[in-house]
UniProtKB/Swiss-Prot annotation:
Keywords: Acetylation, ATP-binding, Ligase, Magnesium, Metal-binding, Nucleotide-binding. Acetylated. Deacetylation by the SIR2-homolog deacetylase activates the enzyme. InterPro entries: Ac_CoA_lig, ACAS_N, AMP-bd_C, AMP-bd_C_sf, AMP-binding_CS, AMP-dep_synth/lig_dom, ANL_N_sf. This is Acetyl-coenzyme A synthetase. GO terms for molecular function: acetate-CoA ligase activity; AMP binding; ATP binding; metal ion binding. CoA binds at residues 191-194, 311, 335, 523, 584. It comes from Escherichia coli O6:H1 (strain CFT073 / ATCC 700928 / UPEC). ATP binds at residues 387-389, 411-416, 500, 515, 526. Its cofactor is Mg(2+). The keyword Metal-binding applies. GO terms for biological process: acetyl-CoA biosynthetic process from acetate; chemotaxis. It is an enzyme of class 6 (ligase). Its EC number is 6.2.1.1. GO terms for cellular component: cytosol.
């Protein structure tokens, strides 16, 4: 695997990069051998009100999982993201907003964003929200979503952002679990030309008899669409901020005061409210942003993630703003109204750094050159990928077509629970291999272990664990520390278990193979679904694939592949045989799919993650309990897949 084609560091990157290979090695060694010294120094990336004396105080020990960083220091996140930039860079653009409709866009300076955040902070205080209260934010991708988040941080309220694609049931569950006192929403959201009934969803969520904590709903007017109104409870955003003062002194917060709760789907039971605190989280978000994207002042940065996901928290807002960057916020989708929309936005705003997801990349790849038609993308310097392992074919297409063969691709592996990047290239320090997340970030100590938790050395494959803490690590699950310990620290003692499997090659590069529960065991051989999917997608006629295991009398598990073809391609018996032979040739006979299920679309969450749990159930013919489908972008896909399944002959 180490013999795979390596992409060397381009000269234009090497000439001005923040970290070169020698610096990476020296800094990484210090970060794991002397974490107090290293993180004590790196913590200075922020402005502290009371400087910290203690740096690291952490334990992964069974029954005593405790994570504290900079615990005697005080600061305010919003002051670090706004106030400290005003004197020298107040007129610099903080947020470029690009609407769903390309004719709508605006630039908001640091000065203007600071004013809006102070006004909304005063509004929250007027509504009786105080330090420690939880505020639910259910908004579209508009600047006011950022204003609401920063205003919460400014007064010390804990925000719980709920992705705008979630159903009323999902919204209610998150409000109940966090006891939110206030909900901030919009009349409607806009996405790919369609309106999304956000206020109606909130109204429906609040009808749940178990929602008892909410006192008010603040509503932003985005479309002017018709909505129901409950006097006394519902309040217009514009009415409130008009009367609010633009003067506000940011609240002094302890580094370990809660900053936000973000719910992530559990494979079983209710969603998990991942809790991040203020100091360590922001140090880590700022430092990873600066070094992984090789950020230079003046760069225009675009992260396509929604604020409802951790990527939107750390790398659309907090990391970039802490560094004084210009961050682009996009309301739309990358391939609407034309497949070239993403490339058009890059050209329009002269984007230098683009961070998006493999799902978007594969969707554009299926369109071929239409995805870049009429654009030159010459402003781009760095590309990034997030959300799932990227298959080498999509990586190469992204590098070649979007980045004109000159932009390093930082393939970042991390999770909601990690707060920031864990395994990732650094543009000036890492030679790249398509499909590999490469090397750990500073302070991150990954290891591969076998099923008993024994460390595996050298080039090998196993479960990916982290053996010591890092500042961005989640501190607990909201209101359920026992579940936190059970979920992340009980599988392997004294280690954080990511739930992912990985392979390490001869160069020490890590290749994420997917969730450990996405590893198939075919005739005693372990096969990562990501590897089979990658082979399928490498076929010139295939746009997307998802592979699951189904029970098999002889092999233990058989391979069931859902396959979406490129536009203009049609399924046929000949293609069926061709695709099976293709995988056999790419990986070996063991990996040959037993079943190919042709389909137009896969069940995905709004963030583009494929819901494999549902695919496993459908493939196995188990439709008794498909679980929570409220997070699906298009719940109708499930019915369609079930219908298609009826016509498929299953292996015995």
């Amino acid at each position: 695997m180490s013999q795979i084609h390596k992409h060397t560091i381009p000269a234009n990157i090497a000439d001005r990069c923040l970290i070169n290979p020698q610096q990476y090695e020296a800094m990484y060694q210090q970060s794991i051998n002397a974490p107090d010294t290293f993180w004590g120094e790196q913590g200075k990336i922020l402005d502290w009100i009371t400087p910290y004396q203690k740096v690291k105080n952490t334990s992964f020990a069974p029954g005593n999982v405790s994570i504290k960083w900079y615990e005697d220091g005080t600061l305010n996140l919003a002051a670090n993201c706004l106030d400290r930039h005003l004197q020298e860079n107040g007129d610099r653009t903080a947020i470029i907003w690009e609407g769903d409709d390309a004719s709508q866009s605006k630039h908001i300076s640091y000065k203007e964003l600071h004013r809006d955040v102070c006004r909304f902070a005063n509004t929250l205080l007027e509504l009786g929200i105080k330090k420690g209260d939880v505020v639910a934010i259910y908004m579209p991708m508009v600047p006011e979503a950022a204003v609401a988040m920063l205003a919460c941080a400014r007064i010390g309220a804990v925000h719980s952002v709920i992705f705008g694609g979630f159903s009323p049931e999902a919204v209610a569950g998150r409000i109940i679990d966090s006891s939110s006192r206030l909900v901030i929403t919009s009349d409607e959201g806009v996405r790919a030309g369609r309106s999304i009934p956000l206020k109606k969803n909130v109204d429906d969520a609040l009808k749940n008899p178990n929602v008892t904590s909410v006192e008010h709903v603040v509503v932003l007017k985005r479309t002017g669409g018709k909505i129901d109104w409950q006097e006394g409870r519902d309040l217009w955003w514009h009415d409130l901020v008009e009367q609010a003062s633009a003067q506000h002194q940011a609240e002094e917060m302890n580094a370990e005061d809660p900053l936000f709760i973000l719910y992530t789907s559990g494979s079983t039971g209710k969603p998990k409210g991942v809790l991040h605190t203020t100091g360590g989280y922001l140090v880590y978000a700022a430092l990873t942003f600066k070094y992984v994207f090789d950020y230079h002042p003046g760069d225009i940065y675009w992260c396509t993630a929604d604020v409802g996901w951790v990527t939107g928290h750390s790398y659309l807002l907090y990391g970039p703003l802490a560094c004084g960057a210009t961050t682009l916020m996009f309301e739309g989708v990358p391939n609407w109204p034309t497949p070239a929309r993403m490339a058009q936005v890059v050209d329009k705003h002269q984007v230098n750094i683009l961070y998006t997801a493999p799902t978007a990349i594969r969707a554009l790849m299926a369109e071929g050159d239409k995805a870049i038609e009429g654009t030159d993308r010459s402003s781009l310097r760095i590309l990034g990928s997030v959300g799932e392992p990227i298959n080498p074919e999509a990586w190469e297409w992204y590098w070649k077509k979007i980045g004109n063969e000159k932009c390093p691709v930082v393939d970042t592996w991390w999770q909601t629970e990690t707060g920031g990047f864990m395994i990732t290239p650094l543009p000036g320090a890492t030679e790249l291999k398509a499909g590999s997340a490469t090397r750990p970030f500073f302070g991150v100590q990954p290891a591969l272990v076998d099923n008993e938790g024994n460390p595996l050395e050298g080039a090998t494959e196993g479960s990916l664990v982290i053996t010591d803490s890092w500042p961005g690590q989640a501190r607990t699950l909201f209101g359920d520390h026992e579940r936190f310990e059970q979920t992340y620290f009980s599988t392997f003692k004294n280690m954080y278990f990511s739930g992912d499997g990985a392979r390490r090659d001869e160069d020490g590069y890590y290749w994420i193979t997917g969730r450990v529960d996405d590893v198939l065991n075919v005739s005693g051989h372990r096969l990562g679904t990501a590897e089979i999917e990658s082979a399928l997608v490498a076929h010139p006629k295939i746009a997307e694939a998802a592979v699951v295991g189904i029970p098999h009398n002889i092999k233990g598990q058989a391979i069931y592949a859902y396959v979406t073809l490129n536009h203009g391609e049609e399924p046929s018996p000949e293609l069926y045989a061709e695709v099976r032979n293709w995988v056999r040739k790419e990986i070996g006979p063991l990996a040959t799919p037993d079943v190919l299920h042709w389909t137009d679309s896969l069940p995905k969450t709004r963030s583009g993650k494929i819901m494999r749990r549902i695919l496993r159930k459908i493939a196995a013919g188990d439709t008794s309990n498909l679980g929570d489908t409220s997070t699906l972008a298009d719940p109708g896909v499930v019915e369609k897949l079930l219908e298609e399944k009826q016509a498929i002959a299953m292996p015995s």
